[in-house]
Amino acid sequence: MTTSKSQNYLLKLATGSGVCMSAFLLTPEPVDANICSLDNPLSINVMGCYKTPDRYVVKILEMGLCTSNPLSGTNFEGSTCTPTYTNADGVEIDVAAGAATLTGGTSTRPASDIYPHAYVKMANTFGLKGSYQLNSNTYCSKSDGTADATPGCTAQNFTETLRSFSGRCSNPYNTDDAKASEVLTEGTMSARLTNSSYVTATDCDATHLVGALALTNSVVIDDSTAGLEVQFTVSNSGMTIIPTNNNGNVVGQFAGGPFQAVFSLY
């Protein structure tokens, strides 16, 4: 197992082959996963639609591979996991901006083995920015995530914090509010909202997010494997455009959408 300071751990954002992990993001309303289309204003529908954001900043603290599911129990259990990248303070990267570099952390080559699971640990805050043209009107994100329809507007940065997968903080906070899962082509994705010790949240006060993927096809590390590359993409998915009415013809709010992280061997 080889460990080194990761000063040039490249995150390629182009589409590529590898292990795909979809992360979950909170939107203020349930969203039908339509892709926004300028050619079809009805694509926004009453529930909203997805588009590529101008800015999508995430803070990564750890990524790695596991020989068993780290989220099979109530909390994250990493005893069978090998971190491929760690940074105790976290490193912020703008996934929407193109190639980014994970700096200040430690990169580790996993031992030769078969890994049926992959995971990522991150902060539960997301830095976003975007705009959308609908019915000849351009809407821009404001600093609180609401839409600015002023002619000639400029999109502003805003921050979204994920505290519940249900889109609301129940009273009392339900255990289902802190977890989510989805069956993907690449495997079954699970996610948990946690505290800084990666204990699953029991109240609306989460500070971190963990995602784990039970892979359809395991990652096989052998002696010829030099390491892992990670690719992120938010194309047609990283931002949610939310209308103000049932007709879906006026934009009221911008929110986060899902992104994907892809682990590739080299």
Where do the model's predicted regions map?
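Initiator methionine at the very start of the polypeptide chain
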Residues: M1-T2, A33
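Conserved anionic group-binding/transfer micro-motifs
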Residues: Q7-L10, L26, Y115
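Intrinsic disorder/low-complexity segments
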Residues: T15, F24, T146-T150
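C-terminal segment of classical bacterial N-terminal signal peptides
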Residues: C20-P30
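A short, solvent-exposed, low-complexity linear motif enriched for acidic/polar residues
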Residues: D32-Y266
